[in-house]
């Protein structure tokens, strides 16, 4: 119990003593009632939200945070990608009447990805358990039963046959159910591309503070992965909503507000899948009769092998005049009629991630550690330089000309002019700009809405 400070010695008469005792007792009772009420307010009940989940658990503020009036809660998100499985342990704090803030993140990754255990699902449990131990180490014991635990799988499991993928997910679910954390029936799933884009949009706008103030300007999100690419932003022009093709709009509810987002994932237009298409290959199939795939986008003297989606291809460059023009022509063929262009996008501030960042950093367009800003035209300038000097100054990667040309033309197809500024970042306020934060935050928010009408 909090100690009431003594501000001086009280000299009480026999008559005043009973009165003083009553006053003291009244203060004590009032304090106890206040303490219990504060503790009750610090609880937030998470009720089962989706897919028949059944639970009613309670989370509460740690003593230090409760003293500041902040509600503390945690969330655990597993990112099951194609090359590895990563755990993110997030700690949030919510001041009274305000939106939550991220106060701490713990991250750990293990290789290989879950898909590597497709033929022996039992072996997948060891890595999952190891990562769960990380969560136990960084989340106070009293919070375990109220901390949501979720796994979202991306490209790696999407490429597996359905039966194998489901067996892996079922094994993960068994391990999760045996853990001390809060687990619903929807605790493991394979993300679709749009969900990935929306979750990344939440992450960026949460970290930049755009979600905290109603009516504040939000930022758009561009993500270029290996198999797909996503674009997500919040339209302010009614014409954008009316002209959007089916499947390009999605509703997001956060903080008791509904956002109608323009969001679409282009499967097959991720950088690795685009490489294969530019080379003339077919996804998931070896070249006919082991034919060598030749492209003007590769270094003229290059000849070698390239593996994609567990298929190995023989590839080589070709000698020709005007390699950039030939490469750009081929890339344009691959992109033709594949991307929907919206006029409003050029007027929205965008962050770009993943391979956009990696390529820009590799060729000195931004600082490799800190990130930075560039204009879309910088990718075209870099592409022309690299492609036109392939023969005299071969780059370290034989795909440099192809990749830069592809990114340049992809951004053009999205409707961005050459002078459009993009912000490239791996971290915002020292937090990874991945979809994981947005996904767990949205999950927790949706659970809370089932019990509490306002955050």
Curated annotation (Swiss-Prot):
Its cofactor is Mg(2+); Ca(2+). Residues 33-455 are lumenal. GO terms for cellular component: cell surface; extracellular space; Golgi apparatus; Golgi membrane; plasma membrane. N-glycosylated. One of its GO terms (biological process) is response to calcium ion. Pfam families: GDA1_CD39. The chain crosses the membrane at residues 13-32. The active site is at 196 (proton acceptor). Disulfide bonds join 297-327, 387-401. GO terms for molecular function: ATP binding; CDP phosphatase activity; GDP phosphatase activity; guanosine-5'-triphosphate,3'-diphosphate diphosphatase activity; IDP phosphatase activity; nucleoside diphosphate phosphatase activity; ribonucleoside triphosphate phosphatase activity; UDP phosphatase activity. It is found in: Golgi apparatus membrane; Secreted; Cell membrane. It comes from the Eukaryota. It is a single-pass type II membrane protein. Strongly and equally activated by either Ca(2+) or Mg(2+). Belongs to the GDA1/CD39 NTPase family. This is Ectonucleoside triphosphate diphosphohydrolase 6. The gene is Entpd6.
């Amino acid at each position: 119990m909090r100690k009431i400070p003594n501000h001086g010695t009280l000299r009480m008469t026999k008559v005043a003593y009973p009165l003083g005792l009553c006053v003291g007792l009244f203060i004590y009772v009032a304090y106890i009632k206040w303490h219990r009420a504060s503790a009750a307010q610090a609880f937030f009940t998470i009720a089962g939200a989706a897919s028949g989940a059944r639970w009613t658990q309670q989370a509460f503020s740690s003593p230090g945070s409760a003293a500041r009036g902040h509600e503390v809660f945690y969330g655990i998100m597993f990112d099951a990608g194609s090359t590895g499985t990563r755990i993110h342990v997030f700690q949030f704090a919510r001041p009274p009447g305000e939106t939550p803030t991220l106060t701490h993140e713990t991250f750990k990754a293990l290789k290989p990805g879950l898909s590597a255990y497709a033929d022996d699902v039992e072996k997948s449990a060891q890595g999952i358990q190891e990562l769960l131990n990380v969560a136990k180490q960084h989340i106070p014991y009293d919070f375990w039963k109220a901390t949501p635990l979720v796994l979202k799988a991306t490209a790696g499991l999407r490429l597996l046959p359905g039966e194998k993928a489901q067996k892996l997910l079922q094994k993960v679910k068994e391990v999760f159910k045996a853990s001390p954390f809060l687990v619903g029936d929807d605790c493991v799933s394979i993300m679709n591309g749009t969900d990935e884009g929306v979750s990344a949009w939440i992450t960026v706008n949460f970290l930049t503070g755009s979600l905290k103030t109603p009516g504040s300007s939000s930022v758009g999100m561009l993500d270029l992965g290996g198999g797909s690419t996503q674009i997500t932003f919040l339209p302010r022009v009614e014409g954008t909503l009316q002209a959007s093709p089916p499947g390009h709009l999605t509703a997001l509810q956060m903080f008791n507000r509904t956002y109608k987002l323009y969001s679409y994932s282009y499967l097959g237009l991720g950088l690795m899948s685009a490489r294969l298409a530019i080379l003339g290959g077919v996804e998931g199939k070896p070249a006919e009769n082991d034919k060598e795939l030749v492209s003007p986008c590769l270094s003229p003297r290059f000849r070698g092998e390239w593996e994609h989606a567990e298929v190995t291809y023989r590839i080589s460059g070709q000698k020709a005049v005007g390699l950039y023009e030939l490469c750009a022509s081929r890339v344009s063929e691959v992109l033709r009629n594949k991307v929907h262009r919206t006029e409003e996008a050029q007027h929205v501030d965008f962050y770009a991630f993943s391979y956009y960042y990696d390529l820009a950093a590799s060729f000195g367009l931004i600082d490799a550690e800190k990130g930075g800003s560039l204009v879309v035209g910088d990718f075209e300038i870099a592409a022309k330089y690299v492609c036109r000097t392939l023969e005299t100054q071969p780059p370290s990667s034989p795909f440099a000309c192809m990749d830069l040309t592809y990114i340049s033309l992809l951004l053009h197809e999205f409707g961005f002019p050459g002078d459009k500024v993009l912000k490239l970042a791996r971290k915002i306020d020292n937090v990874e700009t991945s979809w994981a934060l947005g996904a767990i935050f949205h999950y927790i928010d949706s659970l809370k809405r089932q019990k509490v009408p306002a955050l």
